[in-house]
């Protein structure tokens, strides 16, 4: 990372630091959830570790007052940037009534919050893609200046929903930003056993849209790609397919044993490019972050995480008689 790249992209010094703070908050919430899971307090974790830079860099490039996001299950960085809180995410992890995603009904990672235009996802992967296309179409019909931003893993890009959504969006030049977070594994299946093409973005040409592959460990590179896609969408030029390359630093989920399909040496080598470390180094090079500032930031974040954990652990579960609430609109 070279000096002051963020300024060349139109980001202020404060925005550049805020990106790091959001990445660090996502990581610390995620780490706490693993501890809670291993101590038997929450049943399931599906991690964002290693993908925070792509998620936060993308979110900062969007209009967070207007655009719609349709995140996939690892996108803690996206939803935090769009207004969810540590408390919201902990309520979801503990499946408590105050969980804003589903009132304690869904598994963690099924993000949804109407007030922040975070659209609820489903457990079958890639269902969010055609939904994003539908939102973009509705925005076009209602003459609203919005974009729909949708994410998915590289394994999900092999599903029919991806093809149908990408084709429809391209034909109708809809303002959709497709972002594939390629973390090298679809659960246990390595990338080279999933697809024959070199990059997921190579598929874009078949739909008649631009495709670009960027370093998912660099939030500024992702920011630039998403910003350009957002501007292109606003000009009425249609969708863009962005592929971010990162590495999943944890097992697929808390129920997975990744030692059965990848070695510790591979994971340890990937940790050398941990986006929190590389972006931290950039901020220190540019004089925006010092050890003292970082420690203060970490102390503040851990206080937030601790408070969110305590509140969620002590919060009530949903009443049994409310089990069928929210099935139908009233």
Swiss-Prot record:
GO MF term set: 3-methyl-2-oxobutanoate dehydrogenase (2-methylpropanoyl-transferring) activity; metal ion binding
Any one of the GO BP annotations: branched-chain amino acid catabolic process
Basic and acidic residues: compositionally biased ranges: 259-272
Binding site for substrate: 44, 73, 107-110, 123
Chain segments carrying region Disordered: 249-272
Reactions this protein catalyses: N(6)-[(R)-lipoyl]-L-lysyl-[protein] + 3-methyl-2-oxobutanoate + H(+) = N(6)-[(R)-S(8)-2-methylpropanoyldihydrolipoyl]-L-lysyl-[protein] + CO2
Quaternary data: Heterotetramer of two alpha and two beta chains. Directly associated with ODBB in the E1 complex.
Function: The branched-chain alpha-keto dehydrogenase complex catalyzes the overall conversion of alpha-keto acids to acyl-CoA and CO(2). It contains multiple copies of three enzymatic components: branched-chain alpha-keto acid decarboxylase (E1), lipoamide acyltransferase (E2) and lipoamide dehydrogenase (E3).
Family of this protein: Belongs to the BCKDHA family.
Name under which the protein is recorded: 2-oxoisovalerate dehydrogenase subunit alpha
Organism expressing this protein natively: Bacillus subtilis (strain 168)
Name of the coding gene: bfmBAA
């Amino acid at each position: 990372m070279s000096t002051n790249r963020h300024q060349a992209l139109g980001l202020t010094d404060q925005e550049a630091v805020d990106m790091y703070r959001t990445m660090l908050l996502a990581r610390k919430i995620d780490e706490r959830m693993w501890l809670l899971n291993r101590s038997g307090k929450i049943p399931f974790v599906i991690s964002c570790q290693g993908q925070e830079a792509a998620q936060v860099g993308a979110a900062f490039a969007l209009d967070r007052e207007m655009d719609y996001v349709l995140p996939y299950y690892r996108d803690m960085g996206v939803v935090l940037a769009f207004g969810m809180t540590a408390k919201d995410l902990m309520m979801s992890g503990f499946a408590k009534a105050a969980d804003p995603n589903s009132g304690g009904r869904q598994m963690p990672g099924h993000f949804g919050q109407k007030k922040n235009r975070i659209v609820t996802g489903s457990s079958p992967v890639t269902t969010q893609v055609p939904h994003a296309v539908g939102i973009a179409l509705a925005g076009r019909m209602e003459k609203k200046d919005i974009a729909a931003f949708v994410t998915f893993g590289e394994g999900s890009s092999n599903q029919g929903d991806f093809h149908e959504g990408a084709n429809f969006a391209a034909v109708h030049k809809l303002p959709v930003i497709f972002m594939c977070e390629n973390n090298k594994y679809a659960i246990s299946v390595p990338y080279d056993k999933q697809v024959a093409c070199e990059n997921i973005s190579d598929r874009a040409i078949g739909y008649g849209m631009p495709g670009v592959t960027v370093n998912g460990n660099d939030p500024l590179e992702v920011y630039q790609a998403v910003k350009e896609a957002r501007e292109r969408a606003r000009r009425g030029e249609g969708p863009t397919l962005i592929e971010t390359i990162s590495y999943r630093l944890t097992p697929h989920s808390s129920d997975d044993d990744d030692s059965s399909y990848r070695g510790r040496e591979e994971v340890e080598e990937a940790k050398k490019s941990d986006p929190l470390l590389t972006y931290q180094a950039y901020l220190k090079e540019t004089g925006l972050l010092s050890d003292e500032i970082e420690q203060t930031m970490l102390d503040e974040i851990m206080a937030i995480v601790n408070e969110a954990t305590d509140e969620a652990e002590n919060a009530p579960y949903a009443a049994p008689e409310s089990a069928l609430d929210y099935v139908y609109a009233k």
